[in-house]
Amino acid sequence: MKKQLVILATLLITASATVPGILSAHDGATGIVKERMDNFKATQGHLKAIGKLMRSQDYAAIIEHAEQIKAWADKMPEYFPAGSGGAPSAAKARIWEDFDGFKAAAQTHATATQGIIEAAKAEDMTALTAAFRATADTCSGCHKVFKK
């Protein structure tokens, strides 16, 4: 259990460092750009909550947060219509240049998040820790390719 707590602490730090831009102000964002920024910010909040809940092993609450993340991941590409890049959006043009790749990245995120849900349902902390890490990794992986 001590090893899992160390891993969990590391994951929380990684998740917090992965998406710092989400919390920055996006002055002037409106419409679908603001909606997607709000969804990304909510996702970070859900990830932080899951990390805290893992310590208390509140599996039901973990599932609720993970379901919210997955719901966003499933619809994320819909929030990136052509022409919705540019300031104040932090989205790279690569999203629209390789939209199939972007959709695949969103699906990878949804699949990783489903892993959190399944591990929490099984009350398997080892699998949950791995799924949490995988989900955080999908965030950073996508940001490296598709976010400014």
Residue ranges and their predicted role:
Residues 135-147:
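The canonical Cys-X-X-Cys-His
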Residues 26-134:
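Extracytoplasmic c-type cytochrome modules immediately beyond a signal peptide or single-pass transmembrane anchor
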Residues 1-9:
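Bacterial N-terminal signal peptides that target proteins for export
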Residues 3-4, 14, 67:
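Hydrophobic residues within membrane-embedded alpha helices
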Residues 15-23:
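C-terminal segment of classical bacterial N-terminal signal peptides
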Residues 19, 133-136:
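Processing junctions and N-termini across compartments
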